[in-house]
Amino acid sequence: MERDILHCDMNNFFASVECRLNPELKKYPVAVCGSVEERHGIVLAKNELAKAHGVKTAETVASAKSKCRGLVIVPPHFEEYLKYSRLARKIYERYTDLIEPFGMDECWLDISGTRRLFGAPEKVADEIRCTVKEELGLTISVGVSFNKVFAKLGSDMKKPDAVTVIPRETFREKIWNLPLSDMIGAGRATTAKLNDYGIYTLGELAQCDAQWITKVLGKNGYMLRCYANGTDNSQVMPADFSMPAKSVGHGVTTTADITRCEDAKPLLLELAQDIGKRLTLQNKYATKVCVNARSSILRNREWQTELPTATRSPMIIADTAYRLFCDNYDWVNPVRSLTVTAFSLVDGGAVIQNSFFNDTIRLEKMEKADGCIRDIRKRFGEGMIKNAVLLTGLAVPKSKAVVSLPGNMLNK
């Protein structure tokens, strides 16, 4: 049976929600931007009026203002974005339960086998587009095709407030003249490498030799060639599906540069506490840790090591990360941001080989203490109990948000 796949993309999502909350903003070019004071001062989203002035996502606020003097800057309100994301998903659920989120503003829908019930897929796509506009006051672009890659490509081809169909019979005429960068999976480095070999369009990618591109780009190159030829068989996964975690990480850009090892200690503990909490929720233990340091000149350095024992203890993770960082960072430049990642995870029920503690009693005590701390925070709030080292003027942004969304591209 031919598959009917939709890709729904909410147009200029953050900026559109802000204009929905404050209709006066619709008259002006608007950009949703991170905090300059907390050094997150980049454009997260912009409306069509700002886009017409050349404002681009991910550029600095200063750059955006230089292009558009009347640009209205608004801070992000992630709770509202999540609210509207969920409301849109409720609309999609009227047609199928196979809905795979791809970020807050995008979803794939598999409506295969529903033609007798709802009509042709392009009709369903247009109904969804109109319903979102009427009920939520937001516009979406919908791509319709026989696989996920082409459905997403379709939603990108015509914006805002549009439906684009890429049928199996004519997909070559529709998409083979498009640049490589238009297709999911073809990032800057991949595109640049293929450009060096004279491959610029999806058609040229589709027609290149399979063995050659595998040699040049590995499995990813072969996969991209398959995508360009319309042979993407990845399934639309339900919203509650999630791949087993291979790692758990957290990073932050500080409000002021770190200039000494000692100043990194409370920050690493703060990151480790988040990691420990998430490992506990997933019933996982980590056996290795990785630290990534980004300098003030935006140069990244990364190191990894084994943990002294399989653990989810924030103190053990933080202590190992601290020693790893201090032993390796050269301090030619101050540090702008740090990321800690715990990986090589094992299940909580697995037998843990204790190589650091001479007895398990101390480990059990630490984990019980960690559990008590988590319980207190869950019951009374995150700020009710802290490690003393976190009271030393930690230069961490006041606002932190972690958004976890399911969704995977799986070939079966």
Model-predicted segments: where are they?
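A generic structural signal for short beta-strands and their flanking turns/coil linkers
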Residues: 26-28, 69, 138, 285-287, ...
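C-terminal hydrophobic structural anchor segments
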Residues: 316, 322-379
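DNA-contacting surface of Y-family translesion DNA polymerases
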Residues: 7, 182, 190-335
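Short, well-ordered strand-loop elements centered on a beta-strand within folded domains, enriched
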Residues: 43-44, 163-164, 300-304, 351-353
